[in-house]
Amino acid sequence: MMDKAIFNGLGRRKTSVARVYIVSGNGKLTINDKIFASAEEYFKDRVRARHAFEPLVVTNNDGKLDVFVRVEGGGLSGQAGAVRLALARALIKMDTSFKPVLKSHGMLSRDPRMVERKKYGLRKARRAPQYSKR
């Protein structure tokens, strides 16, 4: 593995942070130091798994690269979004010709939406206690 070029990318979504390392290979997937046959085993859902690894499909690299993922924080949906952004950024480092394709599919923009904080006097961020007129 030392003779092959390693490309990395960092992605964030909500409170999740993902670091992705890609190496030319045969499609081996490692998430948090565990080898998985498919992403569905980790994300426990086909939709989230497809969402996370969509950059590979769009750039026709599915099964051509070994992917090493380190992801932490948040839930599975946030982690899938973080992996998607990190993977797209790593692919651009590998080959800059992928940039227009990934950009047109909206895979290079960091989703800025975060959970709104809870305010005092309210039950949740915006949910107010029930109002009684009399």
Swiss-Prot record:
Keywords: Ribonucleoprotein, Ribosomal protein. Coiled coil: none annotated. Pfam families: Ribosomal_S9 (PF00380). InterPro entries: Ribosomal_Su5_D2-typ_SF, Ribosomal_uS9, Ribosomal_uS9_bac/plastid, Ribosomal_uS9_CS, Ribsml_uS5_D2-typ_fold_subgr. One of its GO terms (biological process) is translation. SUPFAM superfamilies: Ribosomal protein S5 domain 2-like (SSF54211). One of its GO terms (molecular function) is RNA binding. GO terms for cellular component: cytoplasm; small ribosomal subunit. Belongs to the universal ribosomal protein uS9 family. PANTHER family: RIBOSOMAL PROTEIN S9, SMALL RIBOSOMAL SUBUNIT PROTEIN US9M. NCBIfam families: PRK00132.1 (NF001099). HAMAP family: Ribosomal_uS9_B. This is Small ribosomal subunit protein uS9. It comes from Pseudothermotoga lettingae (strain ATCC BAA-301 / DSM 14385 / NBRC 107922 / TMO) (Thermotoga lettingae). The lineage of its organism: Bacteria, Thermotogati, Thermotogota, Thermotogae, Thermotogales. The gene is rpsI.
